[in-house]
Amino acid sequence: MPLVTTKEMFRKAYDGGYAIGAFNVNNMEIVQGITEAAREVRAPMILQVSKGARAYANHTYLVKLVEAAVIECPEIPIALHLDHGPDFETCKSCIDGGFTSVMIDASSKPFAENIEITRKVVEYAHDHGVVVEAELGALAGIEDDVQVSRSEERRVGKECRSRWS
């Protein structure tokens, strides 16, 4: 079974009433461990790659590790996802490099700019059969290089969410 999209996975999970684990990976041992566990329980999985993992382990090596997991476990649905891609170029690189899902996280930008970047990623991704997740608001907490306080938190309202559903 080749890599699958998260759209396919989520549809089956919703219909079957189960959740799907998403695991950040950055080396062979992590990919092997997660893959072996998924095989044992016959569970689909999302293998995620962060900006930091791409810097640490190299994009090509990570893609090849996930391709090896697909070969070793042909019975397990596996999606390859970019976690918190900071810009269009990173998302494009992952789409062109074989990822089946990307997350654009331009939440550190002004809202209107975030929307435009997200729109550009969505158009490019959909032209290539890739699913997109987007962080349009900003939740309190720390993730990678971004720290958002409670007072800076921006949640996206219903009217905006309905435009993207």
Predicted regions and their residues:
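Active-site cofactor/substrate anionic-group-binding motifs, chiefly glycine-
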Residues: 40-95
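Active-site beta-loop-alpha junctions enriched in small/polar residues
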Residues: 25-28, 50-52, 83-87, 107-109, ...
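Conserved small/polar residues in nucleotide/adenosyl-binding loops
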Residues: 153-160
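Hydrophobic faces of well-ordered beta-strands that scaffold small-molecule active sites
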Residues: 20-24, 45-49, 78-84, 102-104, ...
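Short, well-ordered coil/turn segments that N-cap beta-strands
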Residues: 16-19, 41-45, 74-78, 98-100, ...
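N-terminal amphipathic alpha-helix/helix-capping segment at the start of soluble metabolic enzymes
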Residues: 1-21
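Glycine-rich tight-turn/loop motif centered on a GG-T
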Residues: 18-19, 48-59, 99-117, 144-152
